[in-house]
Amino acid sequence: AINVLKIRGSHGLVGNDAIGGPRFLFMSTIRTQGQSYYFGDDQELLAGMEENAIGNTDVTWEKARKSNIGIDLGLFNSRVTLQADVFKEQRRDILLQRGTVASVAGFFPWSIPFANLGKVTNKGVDGLLEIKNTTSKGLFYSFRGNFTYAKNTVLENDEPAKRFSYLSGKGLALGQTLAFVADGFYQSAEEIAMSPKTFSTV
């Protein structure tokens, strides 16, 4: 018999101002000791002025829209209890330094502005199941287990177009490592000669 039944839910929008990056992102700055050039007959080396950082007055904090639905269930006078939650979080306006600005556009790498460009989604389920009882002789026992599944996906990271789709970080987990998968080791010279061409020498 069910003696506890509770359904929970929440939905909200929160901000995150701990977004990292340098201070005063809204300000453009000029560096007086910039690129150097030779001038005059004696070819004196003089430092020029250059754009040190390009400000962005539209920079704001990161935002997260979070939704959660959960259930608390107790059976047989709470001898069996279950807690389960399904959650989804959509983060947007993640602060990134632009990755699609080409160097031929006249920007130094350190002067490329920051902007709220990133989008990431997190979703998953987690739960807790507990079974407990006291025997007729006064022995108490309990078993508890939990489970969690979570998936993180990058929706937008302002990365430049990749030559091959597998090089893109979009659609993958945040910070996921990209690497080659090895099929094994060569065992003989004959095996090397019979194998397809690889990306490097052996």
Task: Locate each region found by the language model.
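Extracellular/periplasmic, surface-exposed regions of secreted and cell-surface proteins
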Residues: A1-V181
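Alpha-helix N-cap recognition
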Residues: S188-A189, T201
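Short, intrinsically disordered, charge-balanced linker/junction segments flanking boundaries
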Residues: A1, P196-V202
